[in-house]
Structure formats: C-alpha cells, structure tokens
C-alpha cells in the first residue's frame, strides 16, 4: 500500500491509501469496504472509467462526494448494484423495457433511470423521485458492492474535468479528499455509460455512450431481442 501526501484541506487527517488490486485483490476489497462503511470515499475501477464511490445509504459519504467533485446537488448521484435483483429493492414500477435492457446490457455500460422507492433513507441529491442505476462489468467493484451494498458512484474527477482512466489521473484531481484509491490498472472504456430514462412512459436516451443508440431504443421498445443486442454489443466491444 502507498499513501498520497496529505494537504491542508483534510485538517490533519491521515493521508489517503492507494491499494493495488492487481497484486493484492482481497486486501484492496477489504480496505475499500472498511472505508465505505465508515462514511469514507473510495475511488474504484469500473468497466468505463474510474469512479468515486460512497455507501449509498451513508449520508455523510454521499455529501462528501458532492464536496470532493464540486458537484451541484441538482445532478443526483447514480447507484451501482451487484444484480438486477438488488435493483428491485431500490425502485418501484419497473417497466418491461427495463427487464429487456438489463437482459441485453447488464452487467455493462448502461444506466437506467427508474422510479425510486420513496422510503429509502439516502441523500443522492435532487432526485425528484427517480434513481439512476447500473450494474458494472468489473469484478473488483462488484465484490465491494457484495460486501457493502449499493454504492453511490460518479466519475472520479472534479466537475467539468476529464474522467479519470488511470488511478494517477484520479489522484491528480481528487487528491486527499478521498480515503482509499483502488488501482485496478488503466481503464479501456473511456466513455461514460449510456443513460436511459424509463420514467416518462417511453425510453428516452439522456446521454450517449459506447452502446449503439438505435439498438438500445429497439430493445426498449421490444423490437430487438435482448440476446441479439447483447451479441452485437459484444462483437462491437471486441473490435
């Protein structure tokens, strides 16, 4: 484990820890999970870019994300889950389009915006009764979610800056506002996830990504079989 030199904005707190998940995977997962349970911030590798994570149900942690990123609360935090089943506990009225899209693209670079359970004790920003949810295609982050539960995760950068594709890029932007950095090597994705809003009756693509938008729309409308869409995506991702 390495440490990032401390700076004044942590008021004398211990320097952040950098853990190599390639050489010591279990130690990295344990360090990340311990920090998250305590309300800390952790930078994790995902299948797109590096993400800045907090326990979704720890309000101190999610508040720290907004501060670290200098992010407006009008931009609510998305949540990462370990499975479609875990999503069912976070939302209401999951439409058939969501089932089809999850079958095609989960785990993977697709975020679904769905109606949130009103009784959830969390603070993800101004959600207006919705939640953005994704299941990442990254074993390290999925293992952390299995230990901690759903995570509030956004790109590991300050607002308006490029997303971090390496742990050094994340450190250069977020510094000692983070408790643990988990180094999983360079991220190949580069692009953020495709975001589809399913709260308006019809599927609406809010943000494009690496997924083919025509295929995403066709799956949502039931015009393209999810397995065919998954095969097309796998072929495209391999090239």
Where is each model-derived feature located?
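Active-site-adjacent structural elements in enzyme catalytic cores
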Residues: 1-239
């Amino acid at each position: 484990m390495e440490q990032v030199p401390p700076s004044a904005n942590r008021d004398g707190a211990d320097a952040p820890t950098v853990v190599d998940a390639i050489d010591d995977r279990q130690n990295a997962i344990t360090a990340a999970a311990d920090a998250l349970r305590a309300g800390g911030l952790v930078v994790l590798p995902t299948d797109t870019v590096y993400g800045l994570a907090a326990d979704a149900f720890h309000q101190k942690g999610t508040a720290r994300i907004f501060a670290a990123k200098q992010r407006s609360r009008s931009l609510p935090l998305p949540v990462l889950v370990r499975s479609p089943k875990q999503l069912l506990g976070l939302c209401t009225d999951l439409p058939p389009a969501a089932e089809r899209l999850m079958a095609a693209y989960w785990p993977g670079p697709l975020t679904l915006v769905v109606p949130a359970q009103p009784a959830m004790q969390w603070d993800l920003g101004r959600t207006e009764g919705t939640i953005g949810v994704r299941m990442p295609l990254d074993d390290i982050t999925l293992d952390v979610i299995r230990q901690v539960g759903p995570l509030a995760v956004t790109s590991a950068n300050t607002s308006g800056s490029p997303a971090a594709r390496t742990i050094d890029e994340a450190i250069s932007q977020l510094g000692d506002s983070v408790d643990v950095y988990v180094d999983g090597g360079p991220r190949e994705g580069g692009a953020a996830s495709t975001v589809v809003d399913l709260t308006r009756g019809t599927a609406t693509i809010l943000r494009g990504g690496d997924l083919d938008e025509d295929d995403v729309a066709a799956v949502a409308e039931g015009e393209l079989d999810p397995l065919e869409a998954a095969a097309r995506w796998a072929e495209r991702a391999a090239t």
